[in-house]
Amino acid sequence: PRNDSKGIPTETEYVLAYGKNPEWTPKKLPRTEEMDAKYGNPDNDVMPWTSDNPCAPGAKTHQGMVYAIQHPFTGEMLYPAISSCWRYEQKTMLVYMCGWCEYELKNLKDEAQRAKICGIDANEVRKDIKGIVLKNGLEESKAHAQAVLKRGQWPRFYFTRNGNGGIRRKTYLENVEGKMVTNFWPYTEVGHTDEAKKELKALFDGEIPFDTPKPTRLLQRIIQIATN
């Protein structure tokens, strides 16, 4: 804004977007170095990853994905957060957990706990859902899990705090998409009015043939997210 502006100067402009299809979704932008910097490789995995939520919403409608997973280091029974379920179906989670030590399915008669997570009455919860529990004793299971922890390249679902913390999920950099388009485009990315005026002056021998020109970078952004 100008130094002699009155009141509170405006620093935003609005671009109206129209589409024939109400289900239209803009294309994602290229990822930034800052976004990719959040991905690392603390366990010497084959590709960089970041720590992610092991759960997903929808416990009430996905009762088959709400159950206990026994911690291989502490023996604690872990459940999804209230109203949440595990990210993947049980047979997939069982495969991931067997990457730490041997596991099996067992009926824990934990209907009350699962009903609480799902937000339903205990008599409404499914009775056939088993927990993923250690197949062998805790000491044997823990020793195997500690060997995996020391070896590196941990399974997709891992345990924080050197094995003593909660469960988390790896999200690999190669599997994530670009940057989501929002309704705020900073001038550092798409330019500003002064930049647009300078571009016009360069094209029209110092003249600005029309008011409120738009910078080339803004037009490029619009084309980038809306076309192939």
Residue ranges and their predicted role:
Residues P1-T227:
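Class I S-adenosyl-L-methionine
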